[in-house]
């Protein structure tokens, strides 16, 4: 369980408390000391950097399907495997990454929006973005968590979608994730090295989903090509 994952991440659990509830809950408050010259920030990408995603999306939609008893075992197992896979390998190559954030409650679009700064914009290709198997089928059937709908409503003014992107696909991009992957901003100089390293280390393929550009009207452009 949680203790196993903390041990894998070399984290000590000190204290804690339990609550009584109909729905199981588990969370951690993280404290520690770090070297300030090793910090990866979410607002420091550079123009022409590639945007990398290290895990497929879809855990919010799938966990909503689980609550409605609409999720098959294979999809459930895939989601659990993804959520219990740690994002620890990135620390080994942090000096080759310009910016980094995890994809969690604000969905890919929300966290990518936070990375856009200093007149930088993100251009991503929907067709390059990986999803857990069965996510699209569930989304087409309107199995969308409230948080994902709220995400899209909040960020939509900062995003321009290609006219071919359907509404359910927008929800998939805004899907609130639990233990999602990382969004990385990497220069052309290091892109091949970073992708090769992560794909050799991780069970999920790291994919390039777009680039950071500049001087556009919106923070994010979602294309179909």
Tell where the protein language model's regions lie, with residue ranges:
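Helix-biased detector of long, well-ordered alpha-helical tracts
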Residues: 1-225
């Amino acid at each position: 369980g949680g203790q196993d994952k903390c041990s894998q991440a070399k984290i000590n659990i000190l204290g804690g408390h339990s609550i009584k509830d109909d729905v199981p809950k588990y969370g951690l408050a993280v404290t520690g000391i770090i070297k300030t010259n090793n910090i990866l920030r979410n607002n420091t990408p550079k123009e022409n950097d590639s945007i990398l995603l290290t895990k497929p999306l879809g855990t919010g939609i799938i966990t909503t399907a689980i609550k409605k008893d609409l999720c098959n075992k294979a999809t459930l197992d895939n989601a659990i495997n993804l959520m219990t896979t740690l994002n620890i390998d990135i620390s080994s190559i942090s000096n080759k990454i310009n910016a980094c954030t995890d994809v969690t409650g604000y969905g890919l679009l929300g966290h990518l929006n936070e990375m856009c700064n200093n007149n930088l914009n993100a251009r991503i290709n929907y067709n390059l973005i990986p999803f857990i198997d069965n996510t699209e089928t569930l989304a087409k059937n309107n199995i969308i968590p409230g948080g994902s709908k709220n995400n899209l409503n909040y960020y939509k003014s900062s995003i321009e979608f290609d006219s071919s992107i359907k509404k359910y696909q927008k929800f998939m991009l805004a899907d609130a994730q639990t233990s999602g992957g990382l969004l990385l901003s990497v220069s052309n100089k290091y892109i091949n090295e970073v992708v090769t390293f992560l794909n050799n280390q991780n069970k999920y393929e790291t994919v390039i989903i777009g680039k950071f550009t500049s001087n556009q009207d919106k923070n994010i452009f979602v294309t179909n090509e």
